[in-house]
């Protein structure tokens, strides 16, 4: 229900979505800010560093998304990919977004996020750069999102299409999951279990 309502607001009533997003960001920071400020990842994946998206130049994020092939967005459209949308997400305290940066060349290898809500739920998503696919980074990013989400006390969820084989396998291999509901278009609404 909440998932469907969020998509209606985001897609049809964007002005109301933006207002709710700002309020949620403030309330989330009040409830979880202290825990987040004290949070450190246990370890970085070998060869990569985890960097909060808010610490990455907006233009670099826009460039990352623009370099991905069109098919990468078939199942991935959680937000806008223009500078204004990215900047707004970087300022949103409830949008826990991270990038994996390749230590050898400084390139962004992947992007992941928990879109979090002050009432204690988070919805995770991720994108692996076209040149880094097949290296297990989707699974790695799921583990990163689980680590931060569970550490601060969120219940985590995700929607994944059974047609998006790589993402589906990544969700299964990184996490204990429970299928909450089968959605139209071969999508699954999953709860990620600790």
Question: Where are each of the predicted segments found?
Answer:
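Conserved acetyl-CoA-binding loop-helix of GNAT-fold acetyltransferases
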Residues: 134-149, 169, 173
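A short, internal acetyl-CoA/4′-phosphopantetheine-binding micro-motif in the GNAT/acyltransferase core
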Residues: 125-135, 160-161
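Acetyl-CoA-dependent GNAT
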Residues: 74-121
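A conserved beta-turn-beta hairpin within the catalytic core of GNAT-like acetyltransferases
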Residues: 115-124, 133, 185
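Conserved N-terminal entry element of GNAT/NAT acetyltransferase domains
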Residues: 2-56
